[in-house]
Structure formats: structure tokens, C-alpha cells
Amino acid sequence: MFDADKGWSDQLDGKKLSIGIVQARFNEGITNALAEACLRELAALGVDAKNITHLKVPGALEVPCALQALAESENFDALIALGCIIRGETYHFELVANESGSAVTRLALDYQLPIANAILTVENLAQAQARQEEKGRDAARVAVEMANLLYTLA
């Protein structure tokens, strides 16, 4: 997803798309900034606010469960995962990062549904703050582009 705004794509028209967003509340200052940037970019790409479902869950490990519920509804063209995992002093960082990332990827493949993964995994708060705006925008662009790409392949 890095630098999704680089280059050009003709797949960034979001006018007819329905998007689901699942945001972790843990590290809420960062995840709120991710969500705000993501929602602004979705609007800029033409996604109607009434076609966006935005859910909040406790943390990154809960994101996949909510994504699965949205995927099972078959009401969405793409989904977006938002969260922030900051390394601490224990192995918990690796566990949460690996398990949440793996589950998001597995859901995308199992449901053949694009899921833009913007669950940040960073060493410290400064790294998260440096990425919150860009990665929120990137997630919106990835979701719209991949939804449109899969429609062209159907």
C-alpha cells in the first residue's frame, strides 16, 4: 500500500462503490486520524457518504471479526482495516501484528473481496503520527482501485 498515490490509475472512480471500514479504537488518536484521512479521500474519489459503513472495534485483533461480518453480508465492493499497533516491551506486538495481518489477508482471499490493510505496525508514536495521514489516504485509494479492478475481471 505504500505510496498508493504514486503513478496513475484509471480505476479510481468510487461513485458506484459501497465501502466498509473497520477501525480499531486502541491508539485512538492515531486511528481517528487514519479514519479522517480515509473518509476525506473516499469523498474525493466520489464515494457517496451514504455508501460507507464505518464500524469501530476495541483493537486490531477484533478488526478481522468485524471485517468478516461485513464480507458475509455481500453488501460491499471493498473493505478497509484501520488500526495502530505500537511496539511495547513484550512479545504482544508481534502476536497482534502477525495475527491481525494474516487474518485480514485470509479474509480478502477467502471472500474474493479487496481489503485495504491500514493497520499500522510501528516502533513508536512518532512513527505512527508520521504515517497516519498518508496511510489513511492510501487505504481509500487501494480499496477503490482494487474494487474497480476486480469488476473488470468479473
Curated annotation (Swiss-Prot):
5-amino-6-(D-ribitylamino)uracil binds at F26, A60, L61, E62, C84, I85, I86, N117. GO terms for biological process: riboflavin biosynthetic process. Keywords: Riboflavin biosynthesis, Transferase. Pfam families: DMRL_synthase. The keyword Phosphoprotein does not apply. It catalyses: (2S)-2-hydroxy-3-oxobutyl phosphate + 5-amino-6-(D-ribitylamino)uracil = 6,7-dimethyl-8-(1-D-ribityl)lumazine + phosphate + 2 H2O + H(+). Pathway: Cofactor biosynthesis; riboflavin biosynthesis; riboflavin from 2-hydroxy-3-oxobutyl phosphate and 5-amino-6-(D-ribitylamino)uracil: step 1/2. InterPro entries: LS, LS/RS, LS/RS_sf. GO terms for molecular function: 6,7-dimethyl-8-ribityllumazine synthase activity. (2S)-2-hydroxy-3-oxobutyl phosphate binds at E89, T90, R131. GO terms for cellular component: cytosol; riboflavin synthase complex. It is an enzyme of class 2 (transferase). Its EC number is 2.5.1.78. HAMAP family: Lumazine_synth. Belongs to the DMRL synthase family. Catalyzes the formation of 6,7-dimethyl-8-ribityllumazine by condensation of 5-amino-6-(D-ribitylamino)uracil with 3,4-dihydroxy-2-butanone 4-phosphate. This is the penultimate step in the biosynthesis of riboflavin. This is 6,7-dimethyl-8-ribityllumazine synthase. It comes from Polaromonas naphthalenivorans (strain CJ2).
